[in-house]
Every structure is written in C-alpha cells, then in structure tokens.
Amino acid sequence: MQRLLDAATALGWGNLSARGAEEHRDTARRLEQRLPGLFDAIAADHRPIAVETSGQARAVASANAFTGALVAGDPALAGLVGAPVTDKDLLYFHKQPQNADYRAYLAGDPDLAAVLASIDAEPRTAEAARHTVTRLFRADFAAGLTGDEQVSFARALYQLYSAAPDLRAEAPGVDLDPFLAPPDAQWFGYLDDAEEFYQKGPGFSGRTITYAMAQVLLDDLFARAEAAAAGTTADGAVLRFTHAEEIEPLAVLLGLPGSTEPAPAADPYAYRNNPWRGERVAPMAANVQWDVFAGPSGRPGEPVGHLVRMLYNERETAFPSTCVPVSVGSHYYELKELERCFGRGPAA
C-alpha cells in the first residue's frame, strides 16, 4: 500500500497517469481508423482542429496525449491541431459561479445528506468493514477500533484498491486484490456509486439540480453540429477534454444508457432497482462523440440534409426514443429531427 501511496504522491493526486495517457492515445488511434476520410479531408483542405479543455492539468495532459497520437498517426495533421484553449464555463461548469446552487446542494442539501446517510447505515457496511479489518489485523487490534473507525479504514482501503489499476505503470507489481474480499469490494463500490448517482447522475426524481447545469454543453454540441451543417465554421473537428463531473450530467440530458432513471425518494438508489453504474457511465477516458455527415442530395434546389451519429464510449448509441432515426434500428438521425426531439425548434 505504501508503494501505491508513494506513486500517487509522486504523480500528483488527480493528475493523468501513464495508463490514462495511453487510453487517450488508443482512443485517438481508433478515431482515425473509424473516420479516415474525415482526417484526409482535414489535411487536404488545411482545416484546423480545435482543442478545448477545462484548464485543469489532467484535462490538458489528456488533450496533449490524444492530439499527439492523432498527429503521429497522420503526420499531415501537424500544424492543424490547435493549442488547447480553456473554457471553464463549458468544460468545468460544476465549479463556476453560475452553478453555486449545485455546490450548495452538495454541501448542505438535507435530502442528499439523509439518503446517503441511510445508505451508509445499511448493516452490510459495518459487516463488510468489520470483515475487512479482521482479515488484515490481529483480533485485539481490530476489537479496539470503533465501528466508525473500521468503516473509515475499509472505505479508504477501497479507494486505494480501485485506484491501483490506473497506477500500474507508476506502481508496478502492486496488487491489492488480496486485501479486500470480492463481496466487500462490491459493497464499497456500491456506496461510491450511490454517492456519484446522487451528486452527479440522475439523482432524485423530480429534481434536476445534478444535471441541469450540463445544458450549456449540450447546447454547444448542437451549435457545433449546426455550424458544420451550415458551413459556417472553419473547424474540421472539435475535440474537448473534461471530467466525470461534466460527462455524468451530460449523460442524463442525452438519455444515455444507464442514465435515464432517477430514484424516487421512497425507494433509494440500489443495484437491484437502477441500472446506473459509475464504471459504465464514466469509465477512464469516457467520451461522447457526435459525427456530422452530409446526407444524400435532395430534389433540385433543395438543401442537402445532414445526419448525426452519436458514439458513447466509442460505441454507436441511440438518441432517446423520442428521436426518430432515418430507419428502424439505425444510429443515424437527421439533424433537424434531433433539433425537434430535443426541443430546439420545429421539425422541417
């Protein structure tokens, strides 16, 4: 454990690990493989690739790893990739003054405090903590710890346990699997998921405080797609680098898989009643991608339509069921149809 702590300290808590950088490089390579025509056209037309970040060190390092791999894969892009531009209102909105109500919710909302306290107080928490402590320490030492101390230790251990795979390059050979029994690790993972769900995910039924602030990012996705369709942007592509605090609420607004069900006050979030899982909603290098395509030409004199395809964590993903794709089972949608079903204007 000390080796892992030392590695995390040397890296800097919250900074991008070697594994994280490689995840971004791999994602960039796969993007080029999926859309070779896009990058060929960008290079041929000398169109810029815009790069935007939250300004946080981790996001900037992610951008550099990603764009470095893009250029390595296609040297013709050299000179076309812009330097990272910081946009905190768009990509770090949870910390901005306009969302003070969200931070007040985290700090002191009575419903939030009550539901998390009730989940933490489930008997399984004390049981898992006690089991963890008694497996690792002498009986007399374990008996001298209060229940709260056992829980604090076990949950701190789980944080290290869950971080270890991301630090395998910085702390090679460190394996914390023997320190936590799988059922106990699963329970502590659930406690973390419950906290994320109520702080950044669908949250309480009838309340939008955890995700309404992501509207600015959804609006910008539409604005960029509309500009591409209208031919009013010089950018060949726009790459953004942000955080789970932004991806998770955006996933709710987009109705992405696992992010569609808030929890009624009378039936708190649990694995048995809700599909939301942090490892699926926002894994390392989580991403949302919109591809805009010029559609087939219409009748003479009619404008060419544009289609949008969404990828979520690099998988083609349907928009909400209120949006109608170009054909049954397709992942392509007319841009005008998306504008209609997201309430951005009447369908043409």
Residue ranges and their predicted role:
Residues 1-50, 54-238, 242-348:
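Signature for phosphate-centric chemistry
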